[in-house]
Amino acid sequence: MVSEGFTKILLCSFCVGIALSANVSKSKAKFDNYKVLRVQIQDEKAQNYIANPDHEALYNVWAEPRINYTADIMVAPEKLKEITSGLSSNGLEYSTMIEDVQTLIELESTPITTEKDRSAGHPMTWTEYHSQEDMEAYMDYLVERYPDLVSIDDIGTSYEGRAMRVLKICKGGTCGQKPAMWIDGGIHAREWASPAVATFHMKELVENSKNYPSNLLDKLDWYILPVHNPDGYEYSRTDNRMWRKNRYFQNSYTKHQ
């Protein structure tokens, strides 16, 4: 069954994400004494309070507010008193989930890749986080080695001019004749595990397809965009580990995202 094979890939990719998420480098922006508060969202009033766009300058939302769940917000030390006072005055219960964000970042040990080891014909591994350049090199490698199965579509460029490339995996070399599966990663810049999982799907579907039911390629075309937000992703690697959005600015808005 297709679902059985896809589940197998998802389980493998989940393991990749878990392994990598414990291995993140330090970055230039510092978050000393930033705290993450976990807020109880009991009703629509609480949900609207946390989601209020006027509060964007006060805190950074890590987990979106949903009624009967919790929301996580990162707060700068100079804003903490104002935020906790506002939460209390509006009847919102909260607790401190992370005491110091910078300490958490520094506990993550393995660096992102800087050297290009191409002994395998490409620079990719799935034990470290890679640049968009490395991922594109891997995509080119797959096209060169598996031309009857793999091709690339350039679907546009980012605000800063980076390519947005989709890997197409279509058995027989012709896409569009079968139902399609779409996978993308890196919509939120700081979530590095998702591009790693997207490229892991590439590897498993193309290089290790014999390990899965043939239906995955016989019955489906696959389209994989590893980095949906390349500008933000690279910025989170080089400057600000907590950056979430893209790099398009309006009205000189430059706060932590």
Q: How would you label these PLM feature ranges?
A:
Residues 1, 83, 161, 166, ...:
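Structural signal for hydrophobic/aromatic residues that build the beta-strand cores
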Residues 3-21:
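Cleavable N-terminal signal peptides of Sec/SRP-targeted secreted and luminal proteins
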Residues 22-135, 220:
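Intrinsic-disorder/low-complexity accessory segments
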Residues 86, 90, 138-145, 201-208, ...:
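Structured segments of extracytoplasmic/periplasmic soluble domains
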Residues 97, 151-156, 211-215:
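Surface-exposed patches in mature extracellular/periplasmic domains of secreted proteins
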Residues 109-115, 167, 239-241:
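Short, surface-exposed amphipathic charged segments that create phosphate/polyanion-binding patches used
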Residues 127-183, 242-257:
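Soluble metallo-hydrolase cores and metallopeptidase-like ectodomains found primarily
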Residues 159, 174-257:
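Active-site/substrate-binding loop(s) of hydrolase catalytic cores
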